[in-house]
Amino acid sequence: MPVEEFVAGWISGAVGLVLGHPFDTVKVRLQTQSTYQGIVDCVVKTYRHESVLGFFKGMSFPIASVALVNSVLFGVYSNTLLALTATSHQERRAQPPSYTNIFIAGCTGGLLQAYCLAPFDLIKVRLQNQTEPRMQISSSMPRYRGPVHCAASILREEGPQGLFRGSWALVLRDTPTLGMYFVTYEGLCRQYTPEGQNPSSATVLVAGGFAGIASWITATPFDVIKSRMQMDGLKGRKYGGMLDCMASSFRQEGIGVFFKGMTLNSARAFPVNAATFLSYEYLLRLWR
């Protein structure tokens, strides 16, 4: 099993994570808290209350963990295509796989990534939702003092299953969406690359960016439910399950609730995924 795709996926995931984390923090807060009137209000209040560091809450853990999970996505995707088509990453430019095989490989990578990602993503979301200012008196210390303390607290208060809260919504978000993600990327690369050649850096940037936007537009409804399920249990159980969360959210806030954060997701998706694919493709070419 080639391991280059796993390593390239980890490094490219870290690059994308650093670029996108501030957007992700604002998005998560909009989806899970009702104290903000919109994107600008959330950005202003976060900066005023917590300084610029507030936008990077919860990032230290994903740098080591979520970036590693990204290696699972790219590694499983590439190796699934290898199993389906018997062609390596470089050979696929001369012998392009079918879009059906690309979709299957993307869904497989998305499914396995979701299960690996669930505990790490939950901890990230909990940390991002802490809105205490950095300089504060000792009597109002944040609930979680860091990722390790957060994980230990969840295990103690909610049990092992607490770390996988919202995992079904995460699976439903990532499995078909990441199939579409790779289909969009490969389709755009083929459209603007001469047959048998590698796509240019500009093509990779544009294809990766639009693949990210397309996938997040379809993923946002389950992303909202995922974030709300992950915050459930922090102050008592509010939802009886994923379907109850969907029904309750719709009943209280209308259909628009399922698209909270979509503008931010789309704005974040282009630069993050453009950088992710560019670094991924560059590393694979460098090593081969």
Swiss-Prot record:
Tissue expression per record: Widely expressed, with highest levels in testis, liver and kidney and low levels in brain, including cortex, cerebellum, hippocampus and hypothalamus, and heart.
Solcar repeats: 1-83, 97-191, 199-286
Topology relative to the membrane: Multi-pass membrane protein
PROSITE patterns in the cross-refs: SOLCAR (PS50920)
InterPro entries registered for this protein in UniProt: Mit_carrier (IPR002067), Mitochondrial_Carrier (IPR050567), Mitochondrial_sb/sol_carrier (IPR018108), Mt_carrier_dom_sf (IPR023395)
Broad class of where this protein is predominantly found: mitochondrion
GO BP terms: transmembrane transport
Source superkingdom: Eukaryota
Coiled-coil residues: none
A Pfam family assignment: Mito_carr
Entry keywords, A to Z: Membrane, Mitochondrion, Mitochondrion inner membrane, Repeat, Transmembrane, Transmembrane helix, Transport
One Gene Ontology cellular component: mitochondrial inner membrane
Transmembrane segments: 6-26, 58-78, 102-122, 166-186, 202-222, 266-286
Location in or out of the cell: Mitochondrion inner membrane
Family per record: Belongs to the mitochondrial carrier (TC 2.A.29) family.
PANTHER family, A to Z: MITOCHONDRIAL BASIC AMINO ACIDS TRANSPORTER-RELATED, SOLUTE CARRIER FAMILY 25 MEMBER 45
Name the record gives this protein: Solute carrier family 25 member 45
Organism, scientific name: Mus musculus (Mouse)
